[in-house]
């Protein structure tokens, strides 16, 4: 029978195809079994891999599995699962066909198995965003076909192996946000195909960027930010013809930017900020026609800004601030049509603002403050209709504020303070509906405040003080419902304070002092007010009873006016009042007893130069926190016994009254100069000796009516007084000439009582300037006595006296007195029995409060209150300079007291604008304690109160984690701040960093701790200007316990209600910096270190 050729051919195909398909069937089963075995070794929670079943013969249909055209497993891709354990690799070795292994965000721990190096077909290995530790195994670098290696966001340690050069096909290498150390291997130059290299966020990565990096000719992204790379950028970087992003910010680079950078013609983003780069900006950058973002701020760049930058048409962000640049702002910047942000603050630029900038119609941020720019503001600025921020404060600008500025209807903040501007404020400025901040203080502006101000309904902060403004305060100001802060002091305003001001329902701060205002105080004022200064005007009438409704008021200054009548008793409802100054007015009647019912009255009470009669109210004995009392130049009578127990009094003036009787026999009154007692003809000094102290017999002496009339008597009294004081303190006649003693409280002891107890057995601590002893005096009272390290410690000794001797706060250690001679300097404080916060946290403290969150919260809130008082309530402000857990002492109920003011500094307000004190003075950096010092201590940057804020943030982290900032157990010798930052950058559970003694608490308590963690991160921002002010920190901490508990922990760790302070994390390719200067936030760094 003849054969059919077609039929034979069909049988042939059928036979061979059955052979072809029969072989993989066994192979697939084998790979399926290997995968099931691998799954069994994973600690998987839930049913994430429920589709992986032995009953399914074909694994190609399983979740996360892909096969090639031959039915072999080629890809394993599993994401966002919870494996909770190490990565097993033994079974994976059997899947030789595997080309892609991606296990991201699956909570892998342990080390990377070296067996992965046997997967010879592997092209993609992605183990990012896990908790892998240990070193990168060298075996990985045997995978010659590997194109993508992603190991970022883990806890990997060790060095980057030099075998990296074997991966000649590698296209993408991401190692960022680990704990890698050592240098970048020179073998990286072998990777000719490498397009992406990101190893930022490895703080211990050091050495120089190798020259060989220039051999990576395919490189598109080079990200090595937030490392310890040092030295110069190699000139070979110019060989990277395809590179689009170079991110090497927040490192230790030095030397100049190489001219060869101009050869990188594809470059779009250059981020070199926060280094120590010197030299000038290369002219060759003008060749970078695709450049979009140029961030070089906070370096040591000098010379002129090259005109050639104006030939980079794609530029939209230029930040060269905080350098040493000189010369003019290039006119060529007007050729940049896409420019959105130009930040040149804090340099030494001169010349004028170029009119050509008006061509940059997309400009949103123009910040040129803190330079030496002169001339007028060009009228063409009105063409910048997209402008939202215009900061030009602290320059030498002259002329008028151009009316055309009102055409910039998107403006939100204008700060032209500290210039020489003149003329009137353009009416049109108040037609800018989005304007929230208008700061024009310290100029020569004149004219009237226009009624148009009422149209500016979003205005939040208005500072016009220190000008020559005249006329009335317009009634339309009452339309500003959002106004929080108004300062129009030191002008020439007249007329009444408009009653419409009561409509400013958000108002907290009002300063109108030193004007010519008349009329009375409005009967109704905003209940939100915290600060009122109307002193040095011509206001009349009586105080309205409505003053009692201001329950948030802390400071009220009405001095140097013409007020009359009696003080309303309703003032006692001002329960937060700390300072009350009614001096130099025409008040009459008796001082109301109700003033003694204000427990917060601690800073000052001034009722001098009025017509008060009667006696000092008996309730004044309750003002135990009061520091300064002035009732001089009145018609007060009676005795002064009611003041005898005011132990916190530092200053008292009762002169020119009609007081009589015996002066209280206390040390404070015995030390008062006669000038504060004079013209009280019925007043006399006690003749009774003090118990236990040898005294010279004195006759009763009438206090003189006038120093001029009884000059000789005064001199005799002063001489006797001086001798008696020295004799009482020392108890030794032979030491009368050697010791200088000042006591602020009544203390019965001799110098010998103190000195003999300064032994090693009584040491309770050490500070930055001395050692502290516990000393019990004969009366049984226990003191803390600090002995300065050496007689050369004059600065620290004087700092303690000058600072603590003039301030009072419930959370600041109380200085009881001091003494010194040529060889010894001693300071006397209240003794606090529970040691320091440091000893409480780290095992040596008394009591069991160390593990209690509520106690820790109260401690840090108290310290925040103390620092806020120093920074914002003291005039001038005070910097502590050494905030650390050791300097936070604990009272009998574990209440906190800030101590050790040996490094404290008085801060001049010169050069400060809008309360932003990030640039207060040019003094050299302060000393501090290692581990707590802010980054600016390591450079020539200004040290400000924001440095205290950083140290406070470290203390917060110490309280939350229970770890010392330099805890030797932190991996890789990391600092506490970096350890926490790395943990959170790895998107790990923030609860894991909490002190084990704090974990396992109820959800509301955990919420509090996580929110406090968010506050601490604001405090430890690398840039001082990014850190909040202490008064805002207090507000945030107080708000935490009233926080909406429905918010998620992830929201809170990003800032919670504090997020208005949080720098917005953006990948570098999308960075648009936020303003510095007058605002309190600025671009800091990307959340993803590149």
From Swiss-Prot:
A motif (Small peptide recognition) lies at residues 176-177, 198-201, 221-226, 249, 271-273, 319-322, 341-343, 389-393, 415-418, 437-441, 461-463. The active site is at 882 (proton acceptor). It catalyses: L-seryl-[protein] + ATP = O-phospho-L-seryl-[protein] + ADP + H(+); L-threonyl-[protein] + ATP = O-phospho-L-threonyl-[protein] + ADP + H(+). Glycans are attached at residues 43, 107, 263, 359, 420, 434, 455, 606, 653. GO terms for biological process: maintenance of meristem identity; regulation of pollen tube growth; regulation of root meristem growth; response to temperature stimulus. PROSITE patterns: PROTEIN_KINASE_ATP, PROTEIN_KINASE_DOM, PROTEIN_KINASE_ST. Disulfide bonds join 60-67. Disruption phenotype: Smaller root meristem size and fewer root meristematic cortex cells, associated with shorter roots and a slighty reduced sensitivity to RGF1. Insensitivity of pollen tubes to CLE43 and, partially, to CLE45 peptides-mediated growth stimulation. Pollen tubes of plants missing both SKM1 and SKM2 are fully insensitive to CLE45 peptides. Quintuple mutants rgi1 rgi2 rgi3 rgi4 rgi5 display a consistent short primary root phenotype with a small size of meristem associated with a total insensitivity to RGF1 and undetectable levels of PLT1 and PLT2. LRR repeats lie at residues 36-59, 95-119, 120-143, 145-166, 168-191, 216-240, 242-264, 265-288, 289-312, 314-335, 336-360, 362-386, 408-432, 434-456, 457-480, 481-504, 506-526, 527-550, 551-574, 576-598, 600-622, 623-646, 647-670, 1037-1060. ATP binds at residues 764-772, 786. The record marks 786 as: Essential for autophosphorylation activity. Gene3D superfamilies: Phosphorylase Kinase, domain 1 (3.30.200.20), Ribonuclease Inhibitor (3.80.10.10), Transferase(Phosphotransferase) domain 1 (1.10.510.10). It is a single-pass type I membrane protein. The chain crosses the membrane at residues 703-723. A motif (CLE45 peptide binding) lies at residues 269-273. The modification Phosphotyrosine is found at residues 829, 869, 932. Residues 21-702 are extracellular. Its EC number is 2.7.11.1. Pfam families: LRR_1 (PF00560), LRR_14 (PF23598), LRR_8 (PF13855), LRRNT_2 (PF08263), Pkinase (PF00069). Receptor with a serine/threonine-protein kinase activity. Together with SKM1, LRR-rich receptor-like kinase (LRR-RLK) required for male fertility by the perception of CLE43 and CLE45 peptides and the transduction of their promoting action in pollen tubes, especially under relatively high temperature (at 30 degrees Celsius), thus conferring tolerance against high temperature probably through the maintenance of mitochondrial activity. Seems to not be involved in the perception of CLE45 peptide in roots. Self-interacts. Interacts with RGF1; this interaction triggers its phosphorylation and ubiquitination and the formation of heterodimers with SERK1. This is Leucine-rich repeat receptor-like serine/threonine-protein kinase RGI4. It comes from Arabidopsis thaliana (Mouse-ear cress). The gene is RGI4.
């Amino acid at each position: 029978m003849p054969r059919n050729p077609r039929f034979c051919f069909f049988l042939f195909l059928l036979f061979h195809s059955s052979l072809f398909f029969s072989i993989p069937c066994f192979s697939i089963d084998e790979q399926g079994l290997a995968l099931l075995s691998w799954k069994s070794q994973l600690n998987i929670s839930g049913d994430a891999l429920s589709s992986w079943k032995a009953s399914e013969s074909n694994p190609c249909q399983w979740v996360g599995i892909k096969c090639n055209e031959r039915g072999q497993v080629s890809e394993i891709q599993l994401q966002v699962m919870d494996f909770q354990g190490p990565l097993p690799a033994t079974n994976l070795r059997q899947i030789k066909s595997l080309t892609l292994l991606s296990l991201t965000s699956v909570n892998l721990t342990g080390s990377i198995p070296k067996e992965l190096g046997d997967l010879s077909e592997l092209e993609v290995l992605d183990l990012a965003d896990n908790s892998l530790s240990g070193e990168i195994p060298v075996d990985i670098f045997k995978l010659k076909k590997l194109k993508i290696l992603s190991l970022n966001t883990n806890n990997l340690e060790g060095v980057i192996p030099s075998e990296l050069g074997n991966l000649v096909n590698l296209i993408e290498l991401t190692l960022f946000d680990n704990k890698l150390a050592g240098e970048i291997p020179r073998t990286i130059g072998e990777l000719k195909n490498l397009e992406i290299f990101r190893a930022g966020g490895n703080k211990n990565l050091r050495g120089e960027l190798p020259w060989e990096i220039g051999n990576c000719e395919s490189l598109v992204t080079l990200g090595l930010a937030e490392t310890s790379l040092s030295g110069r950028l190699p000139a070979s970087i110019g060989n990277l013809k395809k590179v689009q992003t170079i991110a090497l910010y927040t490192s230790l680079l030095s030397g100049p930017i190489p001219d060869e950078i101009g050869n990188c013609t594809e470059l779009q983003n250059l981020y070199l900020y926060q280094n120590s780069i010197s030299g000038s900006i290369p002219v060759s950058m003008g060749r970078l026609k695709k450049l979009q973002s140029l961030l070089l701020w906070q370096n040591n760049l000098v010379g002129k800004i090259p005109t050639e930058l104006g030939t980079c048409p794609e530029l939209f962000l230029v930040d060269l601030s905080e350098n040493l640049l000189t010369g003019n702002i290039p006119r060529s910047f007007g050729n940049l049509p896409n420019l959105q942000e130009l930040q040149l603050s804090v340099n030494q630029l001169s010349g004028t603002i170029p009119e050509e900038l008006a061509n940059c119609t997309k400009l949103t941020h123009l910040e040129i403050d803190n330079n030496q720019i002169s001339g007028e503001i060009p009228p063409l600025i009105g063409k910048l209709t997209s402008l939202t921020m215009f900061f030009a404060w602290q320059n030498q600008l002259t002329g008028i504020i151009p009316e055309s500025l009102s055409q910039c209807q998107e403006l939100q903040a204008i700060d032209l303070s500290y210039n020489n501007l003149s003329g009137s404020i353009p009416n049109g400025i108040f037609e800018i509906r989005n304007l929230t901040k208008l700061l024009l203080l310290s100029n020569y502006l004149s004219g009237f405040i226009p009624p148009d101000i009422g149209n500016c309904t979003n205005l939040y902060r208005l500072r016009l003080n220190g000008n020559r403004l005249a006329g009335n305060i317009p009634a339309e100001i009452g339309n500003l419902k959002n106004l929080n802060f108004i300062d129009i002091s030191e002008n020439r305003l007249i007329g009444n304070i408009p009653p419409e001001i009561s409509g400013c329902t958000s108002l907290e701060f009002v300063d109108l002092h030193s004007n010519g205002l008349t009329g009375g105080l409005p009967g109704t004022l905003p209940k939100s007010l915290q600060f009122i200064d109307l002193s040095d005007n011509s206001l009349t009438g009586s105080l309205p009873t409505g003053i009692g409704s201001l329950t948030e008021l802390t400071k009220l200054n009405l001095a140097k006016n013409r007020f009359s009548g009696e003080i309303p008793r309703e003032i006692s409802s001002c329960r937060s009042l700390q300072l009350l100054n009614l001096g130099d007015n025409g008040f009459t009647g008796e001082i109301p007893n109700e003033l003694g019912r204000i427990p917060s009255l601690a800073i000052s009470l001034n009722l001098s130069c009025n017509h008060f009669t009667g006696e000092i109210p008996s309730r004044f004995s309750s003002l135990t926190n009061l520091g300064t009392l002035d009732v001089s130049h009145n018609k007060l009578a009676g005795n002064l016994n009611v003041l005898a127990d005011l132990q916190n009094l530092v200053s008292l003036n009762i002169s020119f009254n009609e007081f009589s009787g015996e002066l209280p026999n206390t040390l404070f009154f015995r030390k008062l100069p006669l000038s504060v007692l004079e013209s009280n003809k019925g007043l006399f000094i006690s003749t009774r000796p003090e118990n236990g102290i040898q005294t010279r017999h004195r006759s009763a002496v009438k206090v003189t009516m006038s120093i001029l009339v009884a000059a000789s008597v005064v001199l005799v009294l002063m001489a006797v007084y001086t001798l008696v004081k020295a004799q009482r303190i020392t108890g030794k006649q032979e030491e009368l000439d050697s010791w200088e003693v000042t006591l602020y409280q009544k203390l019965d002891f001799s110098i010998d009582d103190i000195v003999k107890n300064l032994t090693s057995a009584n040491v309770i601590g050490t500070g930055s300037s001395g050692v502290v002893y516990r000393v019990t005096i004969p009366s049984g009272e226990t003191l803390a006595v600090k002995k300065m390290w050496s007689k050369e410690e004059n600065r620290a000794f004087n700092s303690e006296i000058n600072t603590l001797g003039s301030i009072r706060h419930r959370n600041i250690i109380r200085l009881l007195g001091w003494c010194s001679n040529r060889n010894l300097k001693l300071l006397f404080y209240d003794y606090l029995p529970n040691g320091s916060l440091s000893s409480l946290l780290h095992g040596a403290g008394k009591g069991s409060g160390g593990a209690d969150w509520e106690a820790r919260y109260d401690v840090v809130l108290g310290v925040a209150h103390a620092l806020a008082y120093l920074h914002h309530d003291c005039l001038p402000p005070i910097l502590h300079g050494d905030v650390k857990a050791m300097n936070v002492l604990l009272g009998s109920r574990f209440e906190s007291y800030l101590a050790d003011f040996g490094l404290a500094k008085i801060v001049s307000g010169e050069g400060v604008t809008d309360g932003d004190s990030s640039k207060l003075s040019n003094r050299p950096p302060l000393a501090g304690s290692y581990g707590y010092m802010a980054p600016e201590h390591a450079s020539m940057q200004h040290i400000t109160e924001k440095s205290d804020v950083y140290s406070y943030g470290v203390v917060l982290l110490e309280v939350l984690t229970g770890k010392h900032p330099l805890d030797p157990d932190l991996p890789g010798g990391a600092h506490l701040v970096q350890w926490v930052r790395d943990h959170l950058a790895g998107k790990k559970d923030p609860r894991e960093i909490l002190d084990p003694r704090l974990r396992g608490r109820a959800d509301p308590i955990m919420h509090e701790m996580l929110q406090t963690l968010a506050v601490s991160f604001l405090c430890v921002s690398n840039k001082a200007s990014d850190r909040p002010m202490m008064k805002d920190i207090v507000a945030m901490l107080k708000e935490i316990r009233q926080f909406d508990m429905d918010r998620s922990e992830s929201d809170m760790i990003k800032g919670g209600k504090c997020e208005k302070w949080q720098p917005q994390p953006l990948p570098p390719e999308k960075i648009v910096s936020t303003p510095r200067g007058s605002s309190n936030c600025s671009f800091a760094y990307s959340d993803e270190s590149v």
